């Protein structure tokens, strides 16, 4: 068994599939949780303030 480049060719499964709620390719097939909207983890849509672009505040 070797590690490195030869082992990378064995990774063929799709980790994420299309989400039923948001439609993005973010639903983890094994964990059954969407990384984008939180489907499978919570009833509410996943949203955080750090994902939004903040307005530029003048420094002087």
UniProtKB/Swiss-Prot annotation:
One of its GO terms (cellular component) is cytosolic large ribosomal subunit. One of its GO terms (molecular function) is rRNA binding. A zinc finger (C4-type) spans 19-37. It comes from the Archaea. Its cofactor is Zn(2+). Binds to the 23S rRNA. This is Large ribosomal subunit protein eL37.
């Amino acid at each position: 068994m070797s590690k490195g480049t030869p082992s990378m060719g064995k990774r063929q499964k799709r980790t994420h599939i299309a989400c039923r709620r948001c439609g993005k390719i973010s639903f983890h097939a094994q964990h059954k949780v969407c990384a984008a909207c939180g489907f499978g983890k919570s009833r509410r849509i996943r949203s955080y303030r750090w994902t939004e672009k903040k307005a530029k505040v003048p420094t002087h």
